């Protein structure tokens, strides 16, 4: 007779195999990243630190995936050197949510159920124009006119693009395929997850200096 422990182990193994299969299926659907273009150059990146002080950024947002579509207004409260609170309000007063990013950590009121809709921390910081990927000995940079591109790390590779000293794109590449990315063009910011067809777009409407924020906004 097979005991419950054996059944449990079997179920866990089956679930693990299914998860790995889905992961590789998702990676296979993502487009190939290709190689860097341009001439090899020293990997010296422009400064992307958050400006000293506090900022209040107002934006319109829209979220779309295979099962859900939502849009509304949003506010980002940014504090130097590495803190931001993002509040999202649904159109029609139907509710909302928030995410707090401090350094390399994210907290949300809904835990993992909400966090799965958000980009990884490095890509969230790219939304704000900040490069938060540590440089490694594997970094390769190339320049083409006023465009600087670099691959940082190994599997995953973070591919960053600067145009005239501004961070305009950050991609996460796994096994040679571009799984997700953030692009910044003027006041438009877009996050795209290629595996799940998930996207979050922001249209920035205003950016203003602000007085110090209430410390309570950084707590859950």
Identify the residue ranges that each predicted region occupies.
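Short, surface-exposed beta-strand-loop junctions and turns on beta-sheet-rich folds
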Residues: 91-95, 113-116, 155-158, 176
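Residue-level recognition of conserved beta-strand positions in structured domain cores
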Residues: 88-90, 110, 172, 193
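Gly/Pro-enriched, hydrophobic low-complexity segments
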Residues: 141-220
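A short, polar/proline- and glycine-enriched secondary-structure boundary/capping micro-motif
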Residues: 95-103, 118-121, 179-182, 200-203
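N-terminal beta-strand/beta-hairpin edge segment
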Residues: 60-65, 70-106
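Acidic/charged, solvent-exposed loop-and-adjacent secondary-structure segments enriched in E/D, K/R, S/T
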Residues: 106-137
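N-terminal leader/targeting segments and the immediate start of mature chains
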Residues: 28-80, 111, 118, 211-220
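Sec-dependent bacterial lipoprotein signal peptides
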Residues: 1-29
């Amino acid at each position: 007779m097979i005991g419950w422990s054996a059944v449990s182990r079997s179920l866990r193994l089956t679930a693990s195999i299914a998860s790995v299969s889905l992961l590789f299926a998702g990676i296979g659907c993502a487009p190939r990243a290709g190689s860097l273009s341009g001439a090899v150059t020293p990997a010296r990146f422009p400064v992307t630190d958050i400006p000293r002080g506090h900022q209040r950024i107002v934006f319109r947002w829209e979220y779309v995936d295979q099962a859900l579509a939502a849009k509304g207004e949003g506010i980002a409260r940014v504090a130097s050197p590495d803190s931001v609170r993002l509040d999202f309000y649904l159109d029609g007063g139907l509710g909302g949510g928030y995410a707090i990013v401090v350094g390399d950590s994210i907290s949300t009121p809904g835990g993992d159920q909400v966090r799965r809709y958000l980009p990884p921390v490095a890509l969230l910081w790219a939304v704000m124009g900040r490069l938060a990927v540590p440089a490694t000995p594997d970094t390769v940079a190339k320049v083409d006119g006023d465009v600087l591109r670099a691959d940082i790390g190994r599997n995953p590779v973070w591919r960053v693009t600067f145009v005239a000293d501004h961070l305009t794109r950050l991609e996460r590449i796994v096994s040679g395929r571009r799984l997700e990315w953030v692009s910044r063009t003027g006041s438009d910011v877009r996050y795209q997850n290629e595996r799940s067809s998930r996207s979050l777009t922001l249209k920035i409407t205003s950016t203003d200096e602000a007085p110090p924020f209430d410390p309570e906004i950084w707590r859950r």
